[in-house]
């Protein structure tokens, strides 16, 4: 019952003419994001990288947040510490948490070369950052006296690979995490390239009790980026969560590639959405679902992308909206039932309880969320229809959990602009639920006397 937004795309400050001003630019959008139903924003790496024109995935000084003149300037590509703090505090005032992008696998931009005495190789491993914190030498990286051969993980793009078993490195990672949460007021972490190092490092950071908001036992939201198949991610989640009571999530790459198939392959078999290959189907509580991100490049989804967003916003998992899709691709569509805003509204109001697949064939997928209620939440559930047919509306009769129930469409989109009709189940809960060609429709239960125009998403 929460939605995050990835609040950047690759080189977004350059593309938007906001170099060194991205934190300020995001702050201008906080109120709008709050009104749209965004609960958290994932920020790019906040510390100084090997260059002030870098996106930050080549970290140099973890404790320079844009305040020291090094690597080509003072500010990072996104701004400075004061502007970052102002953004986080404004977001917090609007009940939006901020997630920090943690790049702790590798470093870049070393100041000197060194000869590693363990293998005689010369590498750029001498770091003397102007923050005065976390100076590094060859022993901070692999091969190190603390780990000559990497027990877990792999190198990334030839960058010096941090040895987390070195006590100095290990301590610096905790100092960095404490700064982000206890000083800057971040609420969670996204860990980059987790296949590069042992999951135990993330487990320990996730299970640490941070001081935040007057409490001494705050545990952040934690999600890892493991760009791999379902079995690999499942194994990683099993290991990462073995010794922590703060459950760690993973981005659902297998689902994302299935959704690309839905959108970009006209003959994609929708039954593939029902198998156990995706994280959300096997471990919904550990799934961070998404459609595209900053790394996809030429592999981005190009057709009917709202079909993918509709899927992640009605199913379990923690859905992430991509800034470029929301703003640059114009998929927010505020004030209509045909965009991301309407899907977010439906997610918050109706998408509670377990998902139950009612029908799946190559071209039609129908699911019900059974609803959820407690002292703080009332989500009555929904019926979701996804239609892969490109030339006509399609639906079928399914047996729902609701007998003699009126259903109204609240969010929909597709290759036909027609307004979906209301539905009424019979005494056994049966009714036919259609969706537009190459589109989707979300139906929700509504009392007979209620005005449907008051519940259609996006029309408030």
Describe the residue ranges of each PLM region.
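A near-ubiquitous, low-amplitude feature marking generic local secondary-structure context
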Residues: 16, 70, 74, 86, ...
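Acidic/aromatic-lined carbohydrate-recognition and catalytic surfaces
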Residues: 1-156, 162, 195-224
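Short secondary-structure boundary/capping elements
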Residues: 79, 168-172, 304
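Glycan-binding loop/region signatures in secreted carbohydrate-active enzymes
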Residues: 6, 109-171, 240-267, 330-354
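Active-site-proximal helices and loops of the catalytic beta/alpha 8
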Residues: 2-5, 25-32, 38, 45-47, ...
């Amino acid at each position: 019952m929460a939605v995050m937004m990835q609040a950047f795309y690759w080189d977004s400050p350059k593309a938007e003419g906001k170099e060194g001003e991205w934190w300020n630019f995001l702050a201008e959008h906080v109120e709008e994001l709050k009104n749209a139903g965004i609960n958290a924003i994932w920020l790019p790496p906040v510390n100084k990288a090997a260059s002030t024109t870098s996106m930050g995935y080549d970290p140099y000084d973890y404790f320079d947040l844009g305040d020291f003149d090094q690597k080509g300037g003072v500010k990072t590509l996104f701004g400075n510490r004061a502007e970052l703090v102002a953004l986080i505090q404004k977001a917090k005032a609007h009940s939006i948490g901020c997630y920090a992008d943690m790049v702790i696998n590798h470093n870049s931009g070393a100041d000197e070369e060194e000869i590693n005495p363990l293998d005689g190789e010369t590498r750029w491993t001498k770091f003397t950052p102007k923050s005065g914190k976390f100076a590094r030498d060859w022993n901070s990286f692999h091969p190190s006296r603390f780990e000559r051969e990497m027990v877990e993980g792999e190198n990334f793009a030839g960058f010096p690979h941090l040895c987390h078993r070195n006590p100095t490195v290990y301590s610096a990672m905790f100092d960095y995490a404490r700064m982000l949460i206890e000083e800057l007021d971040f609420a969670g972490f996204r860990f980059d390239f987790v296949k590069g190092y042992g999951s135990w490092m993330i487990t320990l950071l996730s299970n640490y009790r941070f001081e935040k908001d007057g409490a001494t036992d705050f545990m952040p939201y934690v999600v890892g980026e493991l760009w791999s198949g379902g079995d690999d991610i499942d194994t990683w989640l099993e290991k990462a969560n073995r010794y922590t009571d703060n459950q760690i999530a993973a981005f659902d790459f297998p689902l994302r590639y299935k959704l690309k198939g839905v959108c970009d392959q006209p003959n994609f078999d929708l039954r593939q959405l029902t198998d156990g290959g995706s994280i959300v189907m096997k471990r919904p509580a550990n799934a961070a679902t998404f459609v595209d991100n900053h790394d996809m490049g030429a592999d981005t989804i190009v057709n009917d992308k709202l079909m993918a967003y509709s899927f992640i916003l009605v199913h379990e998992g923690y859905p992430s909206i991509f800034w470029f899709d929301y703003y640059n691709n114009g998929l927010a569509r505020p004030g209509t039932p045909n965009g991301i805003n309407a899907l977010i509204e439906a997610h918050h109001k109706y998408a509670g309880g377990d998902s139950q697949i009612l029908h799946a064939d190559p071209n039609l997928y129908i699911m019900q969320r059974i609803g959820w209620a407690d002292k703080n939440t009332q989500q009555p559930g929904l019926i979701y229809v996804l239609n892969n047919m490109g030339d006509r509306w399609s639906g079928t009769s399914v047996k729902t959990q609701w007998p003699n129930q009126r259903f109204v469409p609240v969010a929909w989109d597709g290759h036909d602009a027609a307004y979906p009709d209301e539905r009424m189940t019979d005494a056994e809960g049966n009714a036919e639920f259609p969706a537009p060609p190459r589109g989707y429709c979300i139906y929700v239960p509504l009392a007979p006397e209620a005005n449907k125009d008051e519940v259609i998403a996006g029309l408030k």
